[in-house]
UniProtKB/Swiss-Prot annotation:
It comes from Pseudomonas fluorescens (strain ATCC BAA-477 / NRRL B-23932 / Pf-5). The beta subunit is responsible for the synthesis of L-tryptophan from indole and L-serine. Coiled coil: none annotated. Its EC number is 4.2.1.20. This is Tryptophan synthase beta chain. GO terms for cellular component: cytoplasm. Tetramer of two alpha and two beta chains. The keyword Amino-acid biosynthesis applies.
Length: 406
């Protein structure tokens, strides 16, 4: 693909270069093909697009502001830093952008039951939210480890009428929850719509989720033009599966002047093996219906990912990111737990904004880069979610470090 066609993928088989595809059980194939057909039709349907725009505006609260972070900029003493304020959306993160799109599709297809997987709980909450709004049954699969560290979100899902099913398999995190959701889907093919929360899974999910999230990047283009009269020089976003990043990046892929940086979770450090950086520390393989970079051992078994942030500890990454990494269009770096925590505290103190620990990974990368850039360099960081859900984790870490000092 030439530079001018970077936004055209995937091909008809759902491939971005060597990544993506449809690796699913035979029973699911008709459903997947049906979903792809319905999505292609919906994309061209003015009524569908009109309804989507209505809910984005009046229910989600879009457009989200592009905010000049004056104090962060002063602190870094270099690039001019803008925050794309996705944490101000209804439910507190970017996840709702995709959920609104998919729930409208589910309704269009006559589905009565929604299932989803969740890690940090934000996608679970957003799914339960839209299911409540459209009066559909909702079942959320969530690993027991994540349930423990995200109790407030579990309670929110139940308040919204969803059934939360604990997954004890594996490490009881996102990968295991996704496995269970896929099993459920195979069993309940006719009535059920699987609302995947990230740019992973079998085709058409990676492209569909990206398209619903691309509202982030489209707004950013317009807002930056309005505020600065030109495009940004660089974009920074954190990456778990990669939907908030893809939403910001995709509308800029063909703009050669825009540098794009994705930030993975390095956990305790890439060299320790305790991390969630699939591109910086993984190899290609197949998981959850698509071929992408994965954390694997020498026998090809999936290794458990680690991150302080429940939303980043996925052992894979969206196939489009794998491809963009492969062709060198996007630079993928990583940030440790400690670096993310430090950035979290800086953002709280300097801007009065409590970011999600996921978003704090992107901020940490900004703190590394911005001081070395000229003052007219325009940098946009995707503030993908708010940190309310992370209070327990941060409190726990602060107590731990206090104890270690004594």
């Amino acid at each position: 693909m030439t530079q001018s066609q970077l936004r055209n993928g995937p091909d008809d088989n759902g491939l971005f270069g060597a990544f993506g595809g449809r690796y699913v059980a035979e029973t699911l194939m008709p459903l997947i093909l049906d979903l792809a057909r319905e999505y292609e039709k919906a994309k061209e349907d003015p009524e569908f697009l009109k309804e989507l725009a209505y809910f984005q505006r009046d229910y989600v609260g879009r457009p989200s502001p592009l905010y000049f972070a004056e104090r962060l900029t002063e602190h870094c003493g270099g690039a001019k830093i803008y925050l794309k304020r996705e944490e101000l959306n209804h439910t507190g993160a970017h996840k709702i952008n995709n959920c609104i799109g998919q729930i409208l599709l589910a309704r269009r297809m006559g589905k009565k039951r929604i299932i989803a997987e969740t890690g940090a709980g934000m996608h679970g909450v957003a799914t339960a939210t839209v299911a409540a709004r459209f009066g559909l049954d909702c079942v959320i699969y969530m690993g027991t480890t994540d349930i423990e560290r995200q109790q407030a979100n579990v309670f929110r899902m139940k308040l919204l009428g969803a059934e939360v099913i604990p997954v004890v398999a594996g490490t009881g995190t996102l990968k295991d929850a996704m496995n269970e959701a896929l099993r459920d889907w195979v069993t309940n093919v006719d009535s059920t719509f699987y609302l995947i929360g990230t740019v992973a899974g079998p085709h058409p999910y990676p492209a569909m989720v990206r398209d619903f999230q691309a509202v982030i990047g489209k707004e950013t283009r317009e807002q930056m033009q309005a505020q600065e009269g030109r495009l940004p020089d660089s974009l920074v976003a954190c990456i778990g599966g990669g939907s908030n990043a893809m939403g910001l990046f995709h509308p800029f892929l063909d703009d050669k002047s825009v540098e794009i940086i994705g930030v993975e979770a390095a956990g305790y450090g890439i060299e320790t093996g305790k991390h969630a950086a699939s591109l910086n520390g993984g190899v290609p393989g197949v998981l959850h219906g698509n071929r992408t970079f994965l954390l694997q051992d020498d026998d090809g078994q999936i290794i458990d990912a680690h991150s302080i942030s429940a939303g980043l500890d996925y052992p894979g990454i969206g196939p489009e990111h794998a491809w963009l990494h492969d062709i060198g269009r996007v630079e993928y770096t990583s940030v440790t737990d400690d670096e993310a925590l430090a950035a979290f505290h800086q953002c709280c103190r300097l801007e009065g904004i409590i970011p999600a620990l996921e978003s704090a990974h992107a901020l940490a990368e900004v703190f590394k880069r911005a001081p070395n850039l000229p003052k007219d360099h325009l940098m946009v960081v995707n503030l993908s979610g708010r940190g309310d859900k992370d209070m327990q984790t941060v409190m726990h870490h602060m107590q731990q470090s206090q104890q270690e000092k004594h």
